[in-house]
From Swiss-Prot:
It comes from Alteromonas mediterranea (strain DSM 17117 / CIP 110805 / LMG 28347 / Deep ecotype). Residues 30-164 are periplasmic. The chain crosses the membrane at residues 9-29. Belongs to the CcmE/CycJ family. Residues 154-164 have a biased composition (Polar residues). Keywords: Cell inner membrane, Cell membrane, Cytochrome c-type biogenesis, Heme, Iron, Membrane, Metal-binding, Signal-anchor, Transmembrane, Transmembrane helix. This is Cytochrome c-type biogenesis protein CcmE. One of its GO terms (cellular component) is plasma membrane. HAMAP family: CcmE (MF_01959). One of its GO terms (biological process) is cytochrome complex assembly. Heme chaperone required for the biogenesis of c-type cytochromes. Transiently binds heme delivered by CcmC and transfers the heme to apo-cytochromes in a process facilitated by CcmF and CcmH. InterPro entries: CcmE, CcmE-like_sf, NA-bd_OB-fold. The lineage of its organism: Bacteria, Pseudomonadati, Pseudomonadota, Gammaproteobacteria, Alteromonadales. NCBIfam families: PRK13165.1, PRK13254.1-1, PRK13254.1-3, PRK13254.1-5.
Length: 164
């Protein structure tokens, strides 16, 4: 092999190494911003045989379990349970919930898995249209009935106000 050919091969090798390194660094950087979508059943039982890791960022979608919303009177902290067709997952969130958030309504939350079955959400999005649902969630939630707000039971308060 002549010196000129060796020099070309070395240049091609260096360029190839730099391209592979750049792609590797981009994938590593993107890994922190990827949020995988899960349903409550997939968080508890695993998705394709793999459960999400504690501390992993993810998106979860499901229906808010009626009667599960608990608000802290001292702060904006709220916790609620999400369900699809199986087990429930508890979501905690500190902030102002969307206007369309209510029990029996579909939501998508973005956050971190803090424990098996527990999510600390940084963002909560409520479904805008009664008919729309993300395709991943729609597939998992076939057979769950949507609870309309006007059909939600209300309970008597201590001052006698209330209906139904």
């Amino acid at each position: 092999m002549n010196p000129r050919r060796k020099q070309r091969l070395a240049v091609v090798g260096i360029i190839g190494f730099l391209i592979v390194s750049a792609v590797g660094l981009m994938l590593y950087a993107l890994n922190d911003s990827i949020d995988l979508f899960y349903t409550p059943s997939e968080i508890i039982e695993g998705k394709n045989g793999q459960k999400p890791q504690i501390g992993q960022r993810l998106r979860i979608g499901g229906m808010v379990v009626p009667g599960s919303v608990s608000r802290d009177s001292e702060s904006l902290a709220v916790s609620f349970d999400l369900i699809d067709t199986g087990p429930t997952v508890t979501v905690t969130y500190t902030g102002i919930l969307p206007d369309l958030f209510r029990e029996g309504q579909g939501i998508v939350a973005t956050g971190v898995l803090t424990d098996v079955g527990a999510i600390k959400a940084q963002e909560v999005l409520a479904k805008h249209d009664e008919e729309y649902m993300p395709p991943e969630l729609a597939e998992k939630m076939k057979g769950i009935k949507h609870v309309k707000p006007e059909n939600m039971p209300t309970y008597e308060s201590s001052n006698g106000a209330g209906s139904k």
